Swiss-Prot record:
This is 3-methyl-2-oxobutanoate hydroxymethyltransferase. The lineage of its organism: Bacteria, Bacillati, Bacillota, Clostridia, Moorellales. PANTHER family: 3-METHYL-2-OXOBUTANOATE HYDROXYMETHYLTRANSFERASE. Mg(2+) binds at residues 48, 87, 119. Binds 1 Mg(2+) ion per subunit. One of its GO terms (biological process) is pantothenate biosynthetic process. Pathway: Cofactor biosynthesis; (R)-pantothenate biosynthesis; (R)-pantoate from 3-methyl-2-oxobutanoate: step 1/2. Homodecamer; pentamer of dimers. It is found in: Cytoplasm. It comes from Moorella thermoacetica (strain ATCC 39073 / JCM 9320). Keywords: Cytoplasm, Magnesium, Metal-binding, Pantothenate biosynthesis, Transferase. GO terms for cellular component: cytoplasm. Pfam families: Pantoate_transf.
C-alpha cells in the first residue's frame, strides 16, 4: 500500500459529510499498530479493552493510566498515518475535572495519542468541555459503557426502551455541544443508532450498533480470532489466527523434539 498522509479530524468530518464510511480498529502494541495501519485503517483505538484481551483481566476496570500510556507509546512508535485515539481508563476522569484534564494531557504528551476517548453522557459534559478547552480532541462513548457495565446490568444492549433511547439521544446531543469530534455507539439498537447518526453533525462510530453509523470499530483480537474467552454477537471473525498460531507452535514443538529444527538452512557455517 502506498504511503498515506496522516488522517486528520477535518478529514474524518468530511468523510461523514460525503457519506464515506470510517474504519477503526483497536491496537495495543507496535506490531498490531503497524498491521492496522498497513491495512489502511482511518483510526486506531488504544482501548482499555487491552485489560481483557492483552492483560487477562476480567473487565476493563483494573486498567491504569500507566498501562494505557505504556501501550499507547508502543502503538505510536509504529508511526501510523491513522489517527490514534487512547481511552481514559476507569477513575482517571471520574474523580474531578482537573484530574481528567491532567490525565488526558498525559495520554497526549507522554503517550503520543492524537485524541482521547471517555465514556458517559450528560454527567461528563463539564469534563469533556474542559478537556476540549485544553486543546485535546475528545471522542465520546455512549450505549454500553464497559467501565460501568455492572451499573448497567452487565454487558447487554442499551436503549431498547423508549426512555433509554431518548436518554442516549439527549446524551449524544449534549456531548456534541460540549465539543466531541466523534461518538462511539456501543450495543444499541440499529434504528436508534441510525436516528442519532442522522441527527448529529459529527461522525458516529458503531460497535454492535448496526450498519448505519458513519463508521465501525472492532477489537483487533476479536476480528482476527485471537481471543476466544467469549465472542459478542456483533463480532464478525475475519480470520481464526488462534487456531493457526497453535498449529504453528505445535509444528515447532514437534520439529524441535524430533531434531528437525534447526536444520542446515537455519544454521551458520
Amino acid at each position: 500500500m502506498a504511503q498515506r498522509s496522516r488522517v486528520t479530524l477535518p478529514q474524518l468530518q468530511a468523510m461523514k459529510e460525503r457519506g464515506e464510511r470510517i474504519t477503526m480498529v483497536t491496537a495495543y502494541d507496535y506490531p498490531s499498530s503497524l498491521l492496522a495501519d498497513r491495512a489502511g485503517m482511518d483510526m486506531i483505538l488504544v482501548g482499555d479493552s487491552l485489560g481483557m484481551v492483552v492483560l487477562g483481566y476480567s473487565s476493563t476496570v483494573p486498567v491504569t493510566m500507566d498501562e494505557m500510556i505504556h501501550h499507547t507509546k508502543a502503538v505510536v512508535r509504529a508511526n501510523p498515518a491513522a489517527l490514534v485515539v487512547a481511552d481514559l481508563p476507569f477513575l482517571s476522569y471520574q474523580t474531578s475535572v482537573p484530574d481528567a484534564v491532567y490525565n488526558a494531557g498525559r495520554l497526549i504528551k507522554e503517550g503520543g495519542a492524537d485524541a482521547v476517548k471517555l465514556e458517559g453522557g450528560q454527567a461528563v459534559v463539564p469534563t469533556v468541555r474542559a478537556i476540549v478547552n485544553a486543546g485535546i480532541p475528545v471522542m465520546g462513548h455512549l450505549g454500553l459503557t464497559p467501565q460501568s457495565a455492572v451499573q448497567l446490568g452487565g454487558f447487554r444492549v442499551q436503549g431498547r426502551s423508549e426512555a433509554e433511547g431518548e436518554k442516549i439521544a439527549a446524551d449524544a446531543a449534549a456531548l456534541v455541544e460540549a465539543g466531541v469530534f466523534a461518538l462511539v455507539l456501543e450495543c444499541v439498537p440499529a434504528d436508534l443508532a441510525r436516528r442519532i447518526t442522522a441527527a448529529l453533525p459529527v461522525p458516529t462510530i458503531g460497535i454492535g450498533a448496526g450498519p448505519d453509523c458513519d463508521g465501525q470499530v472492532l477489537v483487533y483480537h476479536d476480528l482476527l480470532g485471537l481471543f476466544d474467552r467469549f465472542r459478542p454477537k456483533f463480532v464478525k471473525q475475519y480470520a481464526n489466527l488462534a487456531e493457526a498460531t497453535v498449529a504453528a507452535l505445535e509444528k515447532y514443538r514437534d520439529e524441535v523434539r524430533q531434531g528437525k529444527f534447526p536444520d542446515q538452512e537455519h544454521s551458520f557455517k
